[in-house]
């Protein structure tokens, strides 16, 4: 691969005269400009966008590298023809000779064009996971493929590098069978690690070796559909497992507490490209006692799809509850019913 960025201006002049840009000579070598299209590998979606669905937004920008010299070239998505074009025409990627070249791409792009960015330091916080716009910066996407001068039209199939967790609260009933009205819910996910890295060259996101076990907090309301959503670094869950803790103040000013303990045997890890979705049914037992959240069924689908149904017995606070993790690759949906603490 030759570094031909400095010759792109000449190519542009040649294009004016020849009317097409797939047979231009650079210092005696024929070159072909690479064209890019892209898709996001995800099976299921509710909110269709570059980070949660299967389409790109017009104007989205990615980084593409080809071979040993054309590194970190920024391309912008054009919705009209489902293609990416170089932001800087002088830096667009061309292929010379008959070799096969490795092509990699990642989103969102960082650093400067022409230089390989360092491994990115990642810190997940309650603040940077609070809204879809803030979370978008942490849903890293990565693609890799091959390209030749004979086959310069390259399709990039992006995969999610992170794990995703969705905790959706739905209204249950009170002791008389009346529906519960959901108000603001304060929700915590406890037992996760929040610090690590994303390697733009390999597409691997990982927790740091010394990352501490921590928690994340979100306030849930009608604006976010009472759904706690975070992007997390793929990781092995610690021996203590995970806990979901929540509290809601009722219309008559009572405070209802919810709790779910997920043992590590049921959810041992979070995998890249997997979304783990839990549906939590918020009942009101008309008491001040904390309420244990219990699982009544599961539905697993990667950002591959596996379905599961369970009807566990009611358990007291601190006892096990089934909540099997699986494959965004695979999403996991858990239906959970709270029972009054004994």
Put a short name on every predicted segment.
Residues 2-6, 15-342:
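Sec-type signal peptide cleavage vicinity
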């Amino acid at each position: 691969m030759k570094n031909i960025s400095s010759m792109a201006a000449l190519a542009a002049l040649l294009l004016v005269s020849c009317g097409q840009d797939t047979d231009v000579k650079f210092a005696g070598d024929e070159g072909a400009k690479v064209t890019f299209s892209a898709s996001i590998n995800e099976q299921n979606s509710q909110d269709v966008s570059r980070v949660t669905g299967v389409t790109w937004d017009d104007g989205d920008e990615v980084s593409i590298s080809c071979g040993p010299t054309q590194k970190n070239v920024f391309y912008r998505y054009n919705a009209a023809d489902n293609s990416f074009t170089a932001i800087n025409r002088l830096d667009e990627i061309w292929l010379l000779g008959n070799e096969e070249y490795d092509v990699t791409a990642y989103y969102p792009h960082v650093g400067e064009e022409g230089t390989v960015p360092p491994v990115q330091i990642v810190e997940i916080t309650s603040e940077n996971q609070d809204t879809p716009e803030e979370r978008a910066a942490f849903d890293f996407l990565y693609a890799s493929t091959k390209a030749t001068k004979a086959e310069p039209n390259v399709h990039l199939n992006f995969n999610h590098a992170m794990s995703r967790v969705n905790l959706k609260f739905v209204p249950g009933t009170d002791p008389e069978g009346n529906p519960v009205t959901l108000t603001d819910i304060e929700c915590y996910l406890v037992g996760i690690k929040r610090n690590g890295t994303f390697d733009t060259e390999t597409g691997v996101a990982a927790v740091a070796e010394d990352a501490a076990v921590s928690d994340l907090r979100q306030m849930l309301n009608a604006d976010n559909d009472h759904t706690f959503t975070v992007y997390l670094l793929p990781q092995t869950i610690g021996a203590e497992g995970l806990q979901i803790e929540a509290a809601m103040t009722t219309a008559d000013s009572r405070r209802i507490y919810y709790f779910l303990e997920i043992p590590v045997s049921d959810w041992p890890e979070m995998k890249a490209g997997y979304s783990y979705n839990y549906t939590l049914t918020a009942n009101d037992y008309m008491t001040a006692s904390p309420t244990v959240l219990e699982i009544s069924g599961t539905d697993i689908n990667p950002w591959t799809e596996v379905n599961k149904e369970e009807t566990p017995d009611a358990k007291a606070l601190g006892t096990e509850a089934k909540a099997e993790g699986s494959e965004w690759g695979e999403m996991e949906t858990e239906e959970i019913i709270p029972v009054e603490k004994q």
